Regions:
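Membrane-interface "cap" regions at the ends of multi-pass membrane proteins
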Residues: 40-92, 146-147, 151, 257, ...
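Flexible loop linkers connecting adjacent transmembrane helices
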Residues: 56-61, 95-100, 123-148, 173, ...
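Selective recognition of specific alpha-helical transmembrane segments in multi-pass small-molecule
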Residues: 112-117, 121, 266-270, 295-323, ...
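Extracellular/periplasmic helix-exit of transmembrane alpha-helices
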Residues: 119-131, 278-288, 306-348
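Loop-to-transmembrane helix boundary motifs in multi-pass membrane proteins
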Residues: 147-149, 184-187, 303, 363, ...
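Hydrophobic alpha-helical segments and their helix-loop junctions in multi-pass secondary transporters
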Residues: 194, 216-248, 255-258, 262-276, ...
Length: 500
């Protein structure tokens, strides 16, 4: 110790506002003191017993910076892959199929725009988790007034329930298509997917990521075969490029469907989930390692959501190749299936792919991909539910209980409506779930952007100008589109409820 006074060093404490430490009479150099303070800052919330997904927290070791780029990338790869499944769930299928069938490649640019916006928003969500040690639900609990916890949690649960509704219906349709199980009973069977979750519990984060990776690979391979192997569906890359880089909404109905695509692509529960999943990585608690973690999570997000974009684009392309320009198709036996803007495109796709493409394999691949989509979304939906419940309310229940409750809340209304209205209600229910998600999305995006743009909350890791402009621009655009589409959304919801 010396009598020389050292400068004041201030670092934002992880999980708190600003920690100011005065280093009077300290012999250490200011830079060394700053690094020590940063280590305390970054570890500040690691000992918090209220962290979400506690059994997965810091469960995957990350090699040090002396190791190769690829080894570190493999260690960080995974959280965004789990998140990406939300961008190719059954809710997306309905809007993507309708876009390709009605406008060919005309709305591919909207799919690309939605994917880019989603990519930036998810990068920001991952940044929050790495830099503060909090997921978005915990941040809202700690940094907003106490009275906001209940409404925030209930709105999140509504969004997760809506997501689960689309997943259940997608899986039910796939079971119906593959095994000819009546839709009513197929929906009931989806309640037992809790067995899938039970089989994964205790396996660890890496194995869960591997299982979801298999599902994602299944979806990708199925569409790859349908697009590039079957001779009847060879796309025109020149037309696709023209549609991507010369955007327009000049045709009637394009704007409404574009709103639906954006609403179905960016999922509010994914923001909570991603900010929690990135904390499954255990890395050194120093400034350089945090910078490294942010970099590799950004790469992980960009890679996984680019894959999700190609899957969504493939669905649009398949629908464009098979359905665009046609008004109906005649099935074996003489049954005529008409094509209209309000058609149940998921059902139509399975019924008509085989006769239109000349092979039964086309319909089977479609159904297998749909089932993989629904089941993988089940895993991530349950994890997201745990994150918001533990983050907002600090309630902990077994994941299988969480799964059963969420699925029952989703399928009981679906069973009732299908029982009363029949199979024609499937698409209406899926579309209704996407409406609920679109309306809840700004309520998740705005806190995320507020926190991550604040130096008080994030310190040196706050969003740069590029992320701030992109994030806030996306939030404003989505909010405006939500307001524009609200009357139609409420009308659609009323029609589903009343059976009109």
């Amino acid at each position: 110790m010396t009598g020389e006074e050292q400068p004041v060093v201030a670092m934002p404490e992880r999980g708190q506002d600003v920690l100011q430490i005065h280093t009077r009479h300290c012999a250490a150099k200011p830079e060394k003191v700053r690094q020590e303070i940063f280590s305390l800052y970054i570890a500040g919330s690691m000992n918090d017993s209220n962290r979400s997904l506690e059994n997965m927290h810091s469960s995957v070791a990350v090699p040090g910076q002396h190791t190769s780029f690829w080894r570190r990338w493999r260690a960080f790869f995974g959280p965004a892959l789990l998140v990406s499944i939300g961008y190719m769930d059954p809710g997306n299928w309905s809007t993507d199929l309708a876009a390709g069938a009605q406008f060919k490649y005309g709305l591919l640019w909207v799919v690309a725009l939605a994917s880019v916006m989603a990519m930036f928003i998810q990068i920001i969500a991952a940044r929050l988790g790495v830099a503060t040690g909090k997921d978005l639900a915990q941040a809202c609990r700690d940094w907003y007034p106490k009275w906001t916890r209940w409404p925030n949690w209930l709105l999140c649960e509504l969004a997760i329930g809506s997501t689960d509704l689309a997943e259940a219906l997608g899986s039910a349709v796939a079971l119906n298509l593959l095994f000819h199980i009546p839709l009513f009973w197929a929906v009931v069977i989806t309640a037992f997917d809790v067995l899938l979750l039970l089989s994964l519990e205790g396996l660890g984060m890496r194995k869960i990521e591997a299982v979801v990776g298999v599902f994602v690979a299944t979806i990708t391979v199925c569409y790859g075969i349908e697009i590039f192997v079957l001779p009847q569906t060879q796309p025109s890359f020149a037309e696709m490029g023209h549609a991507l880089f010369q955007p327009s909404l000049h045709q009637p109905g394009m704007l409404v469907l574009a709103i639906g695509i954006i609403g179905a692509t960016i999922m509010p529960h994914n923001l909570y989930l991603h900010s929690a999943l990135v904390q499954s990585r255990k890395f050194q608690q120093d400034e350089a390692s945090v910078r490294d973690a942010i970099k590799f999570n950004t790469i992980d997000t960009a890679t996984s959501l680019t894959l999700a974009f190609f899957v969504n684009a493939a669905i649009v392309v398949l629908a464009a190749m098979v359905f665009f320009g046609k008004t109906s198709v005649t099935l074996t036996g003489g049954t005529v299936v008409p094509f209209t803007p309000d058609s149940d495109w998921i059902q139509i796709a399975h019924l008509t792919l085989a006769p239109l493409l000349g092979t039964a394999m086309a319909s089977t691949l479609f159904a297998v991909a749909l089932l993989a989509s629904g089941q993988s979304s089940t895993i991530t939906g349950t994890l997201a539910g745990q994150v918001v419940m533990e983050g907002f309310m600090r309630w902990r229940i077994p994941s299988w209980v969480r799964r059963v409750v969420t699925r029952l809340l989703a399928i009981v209304p679906a069973i009732i409506i299908i029982g009363v209205r029949g199979n024609r209600s499937i698409t209406d229910l899926i579309n209704l779930s996407q409406v609920v998600l679109a309306l809840q999305l700004p309520l998740a995006m705005l806190p995320l952007l507020q926190f991550t743009s604040s130096r008080k909350r994030m310190g040196q890791w706050r969003n740069g100008w590029g992320l701030m402009v992109t994030g806030w621009g996306s939030a404003i655009l989505i909010t405006v589109l939500d307001i524009y589409g609200l009357p139609d959304a409420l009308k659609q919801a009323w029609n589903v409820i009343t059976g009109k």
